Amino acid sequence: MIGIDEVDPAKLPTEISISALTLAELSSGPHAVSDDLERARRQDRIQRFEAEADVLAFESRCARAYGQVYAAVVATGRKARGNRSVDLMIAATAIVHELPLYTLNANDLHGLEDLIEIVDVSA
């Protein structure tokens, strides 16, 4: 949801699915601010978003697809561990559910173009 206000709504799908991993990342956001009003605003926004989205679990099929994702990234000479791991697990979830992956950070998914449709929604 970071940067979502800058995204052209025409670039976004009409039906929204979100990985449980993405939801976990988003859910930590309100706790990163010290201002109570801002924390409440962020929490409300996440809850409203979650109510409209289909949340996709990271399950065994996703774990197996992650192996393919990992190999594809390593084949490009990039590291597939550390901070990048969660993004790659999100990609594996999209692969299993045969969904395109909408992102503001398409470069983070370099090497996965043969496995998944990556939709760059950045300006």
Where do the language-model regions lie?
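Alpha-helix/helix-capping structural signal
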Residues: L21-A24, R61, N107
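Acidic, PIN/NYN-like endoribonuclease modules and their adjacent C-terminal/linker elements
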Residues: A91-A123
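Short, hinge-like loop/turn segments at secondary-structure boundaries
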Residues: S34-L37, V74, V119-S122
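Short, well-structured N-terminal submotif of metal-dependent ribonuclease cores
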Residues: M1-Q47
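Short loop->beta-strand "edge-of-pocket" segments that line small-molecule binding or catalytic clefts
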Residues: K11-I18, A51-A57, P100
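Phosphate- and divalent-cation-binding pockets in alpha/beta enzyme and binding domains
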Residues: E25, A65, G111
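Active-site-proximal, substrate-binding regions of enzyme catalytic domains
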Residues: L37-V55, E59-R64
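Active-site neighborhoods of divalent-metal-dependent phosphate/nucleic-acid chemistry enzymes
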Residues: P30, D54-P100
